[in-house]
Amino acid sequence: KYPEFTFVISQPQQLIWIKEHSNEMFERIKEYEKQGRIEIVGGAFVEFDTNVSGEEQLARQMLYGQKYYLENFGHYVNNLWLPDTFGYNGNLPQIIKHGGMNHFMTIKISWNRFNAFPYHNFIWEGIDGTRILSHLPPEGTYNSGASPKSLKSLNDNIEKNETIYNSLMIYGIGDGGGGPNEEHIERVRRINDLMCLNKVECGNVEKFFNGLEKKKNEMPIFKGELYLENHNGTYTSQSFNKQYNRKMEEKIK
């Protein structure tokens, strides 16, 4: 019904559960992925925490995620997709690169309480000097309504301090699950009829980043940790999370 629409799947663990529940559905997903109607993104096993996790755990996220995609879909993924993680440590660019990926997408940093993050398209440089092409969708949400109001908010935010206006609009019901529905897609179809707004093109994440690659020499460089000012005290007030995470890491070793 909507041949232009592409659905994104970002976590192999979800695919494992789908296959356990319905192998028929899993085979349909594989077929749709070949057709370009579904796009696998992320290159990691789940959308993981980067602050408490040790370096071995981070590396294994990439190892097992990419291994799963290669074995089940025949190829690796070229981007790390972490829309809702509470901050990103400064060694992550190096780990992303060693995981076979060249691109990074997050949304959460736009939730800073006091200091607005200054870039949407930028080069993230890790503490060792590794650089990753990165994108922060300017609407600042993974629950976009794909409405004229959504697009105007996106336009206003990116025009404040950007010279490269390419951006993702990630629409659907992202927090709590469900994804896009027909209403969202119908809005996207109609939104280009509004002459006062920038044009929207249905596509996929890899195509978007490949377009940004051509402009990366124009992008600013941000060095070090991507610190999230929101959700302060998450790890301090719930210290048992850190304790049990470390216990599990020791058991894995």
What would you call each of these model-derived segments?
Residues 1-253:
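Catalytic-domain carbohydrate-binding cleft regions of carbohydrate-active enzymes
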